[in-house]
C-alpha cells in the first residue's frame, strides 16, 4: 500500500512548501500555511488532439436572462448568462443567503427552474426563513448537501429541470477525492473547479456563496476568483439598514457597478432613489459638510463628506478617515498647507463619508478639500452645491471623467450649484469652474 504524501500550502497565495512555517515566505502572511495531502495513486493519461478555431469567426452575444431584481441585473451587466459561474462574498449576517433565496424564489419571466443547495443550514431552517420573508414560490427546489459528487449526481438526475443552482456556501462543500477537511485550500479549489466546469458543459448558471476573512477578502485560494466569471461583494455595516452589491470582476459586463439594497423585516428590498438614501435633508448647510457628486460604475451617486477639526496638544495630532483613504487625506492636507497656506499641523482631523460608504474615486478630492477648508474657517459651504474634481500636488484641479453624468444627477436632486474642474463642451450657468485650490478658497469666502 502506497503512502500518501503531503505538503504545505498557503491559503492566501497558494504557494507550496515542503515544511510548515508560521509565515508564508512568498506573500508574508502569518498563520496561512495549511497541510495538504497529495494522493500518489495517479495513472498516466494521454491527451487527444483538439481542433483550432479562428478569432475572426462570427459569434453571437451571450443570452442574458433578466432577473426580477433590477439592481442585481445592473450589477451583472443586464442579467444572468447561461453557463456562467458567479461568486458572491460578504461578511457573516450581511444578507447573502437572504438575497440568494429571494432570487431563487423569484418569478422569472423565462420560467427559470432553480435549485437552492445549503451546506450550512437544515431544510427546516430554509423553510422557516422563506415563511419569514413571505416567499410563496413553492416550486423552488431545496437540498441540504455538502458532498460534491452527491450534488452533481442530484443535478444530473434532474438535468432537464434545473437552470440555476445556488450553493451556500462553497466552503462547506467537499469531494471524496481528497481527505482534507472542508474549507481547506485543496477542497475549495477542487470543488469550485468541478462546479465551474460542470456549469459550462451543461449550460447551467451556478451562484457560489463564500465566506470572507477578517480583512474583508474572500476566504480560500485566490484562484477561486480566477475560476469564476463574475465576482460580487455584498458590502454594508450591521449598524446600517442599507447594503451595496458591487462587482469586482465580470466577464460579461463592466466592473465597479453597484446595486443598492435595504434590509427590512420582510427581506432585502431594492432602493431606487439611491442618492437620497445617503443624504440628510437640512434647511441650512453645516460647517465642514460637503456633497460629492460621484460615479460608481455607470451609476451616479451623491454622497456626504464630513470633516471635523479640533485643536490638539499632542506632538503628533490624530488623523482619522472613515470611508476614505487615510494616505490620500494626508496628501490633501499637505497640498492645502503648501498651496493655500492652510496649516493644520496642530489640529486633530476627522473625516467621514456619511452612511458607511467607501469612496475610491479620485474626483472626491475637491469635496474633501472643501469640507476641510470649511471646518478650518468655520464658514459653511454655499447652499445646494456639489463638488467633484481631482487635486494634483501642485494644487491644480484636474479634469474628471463622466462629468455630465454627475451634473445631471445633482440637478435631478435639486442642487443648483456645481463646483468642479474646468469643463469643455459643457456651459451651464450653475457651473462654477475651479482651476486651482485658490479658486476654491475664494468661493468658500
Swiss-Prot record:
State the gene name recorded for this protein.
radA
Tell me the protein's name: DNA repair protein RadA
Q: Where are the zinc fingers (C4-type)?
A: 10-27
The record ties this protein, via InterPro entries, to: AAA+_ATPase, DNA_repair_RadA, KaiC-like_dom, P-loop_NTPase, RecA_ATP-bd, Ribosomal_Su5_D2-typ_SF, Ribsml_uS5_D2-typ_fold_subgr, Rubredoxin_2
Family per record: Belongs to the RecA family. RadA subfamily.
> Domain description from the entry?
Has a putative N-terminal zinc-finger, a middle region with homology to RecA with ATPase motifs including the RadA KNRFG motif, while the C-terminus is homologous to Lon protease.
Database matches in Pfam families: ATPase (PF06745), ChlI (PF13541), Zn_ribbon_LapB (PF18073)
What this protein is reported to do is described as:
DNA-dependent ATPase involved in processing of recombination intermediates, plays a role in repairing DNA breaks. Stimulates the branch migration of RecA-mediated strand transfer reactions, allowing the 3' invading strand to extend heteroduplex DNA faster. Binds ssDNA in the presence of ADP but not other nucleotides, has ATPase activity that is stimulated by ssDNA and various branched DNA structures, but inhibited by SSB. Does not have RecA's homology-searching function.
Positions bound to ATP: 90-97
**GO BP:** recombinational repair
The record's annotation in HAMAP family points to: RadA_bact
| UniProt short sequence motif RadA KNRFG motif, positions renumbered to this chain | 249-253
Enzyme Commission number(s) of this protein: 3.6.4.-
Which residues lie within the region annotated Lon-protease-like?
Answer: 348-445
Molecular function GO terms recorded: ATP binding; ATP hydrolysis activity; ATP-dependent DNA damage sensor activity; damaged DNA binding; zinc ion binding
Q: What keywords would UniProt list here?
A: ATP-binding, DNA damage, DNA repair, DNA-binding, Hydrolase, Metal-binding, Nucleotide-binding, Stress response, Zinc, Zinc-finger
Task: Write down any Gene Ontology CC term.
Answer: cytosol
